[in-house]
Curated annotation (Swiss-Prot):
This is Holliday junction branch migration complex subunit RuvA. The lineage of its organism: Bacteria, Bacillati, Actinomycetota, Actinomycetes, Mycobacteriales. Residues 64-140 are annotated as: Domain II. GO terms for biological process: DNA recombination; DNA repair. The gene is ruvA. Its main location: cytoplasm.
Amino acid sequence: MIASVNGEVIDIALDHVVIEAAGVGYRVNATPATLSTLRRGTQIRLITAMIVREDSMTLYGFTDTDARDLFTTLLGVSGVGPKIAMATLAVYDAPTLRQALADGDVAALTRVPGIGKRGAERLVLELREKVAAAPGGTTELGRGTASLVRSQVVEALIGLGFAAKQAEQATDTVLAQDNPGDTGADVSGVLRSALALLGKTR
């Protein structure tokens, strides 16, 4: 079992990163928020979960153990696979997701692409007592100029399956709610807000 990968970032795609460690390139699937913090040529360490199936072995990477543990916990729920688990962590960071589950916030959970009302109710039913609300701080993610943030968020949304026009409109709506001159725009925050907005308008 591969619990973490520490090495040089050699490629970044919309849904994964390739990290070279000890001469081996590892493809690690990750959320858009995590990917937005990475840069080619830099050293990075990701906490990982490995999903082994008959025809594949897939790595999923996270910035901390809390997110990784929530990912594996989500996989224990009937009907939840890696794709939905990753989409959930793309919309909500670990503390926020824990809080939503602890509060039984079905409406918040249905904002995740792929989770309907019944699926959200199942998540609450099976995880409410298992997941404690917001145990600690969150990992600080990348920040940048508004134009850079916009392009990264739009690309991430398209990678999650949304149409380009939808992605652009949602991103612009979220950015318009903030100070347009803010050079400390949070990629992670804008992405989550855009996903929540798209979830409301599905």
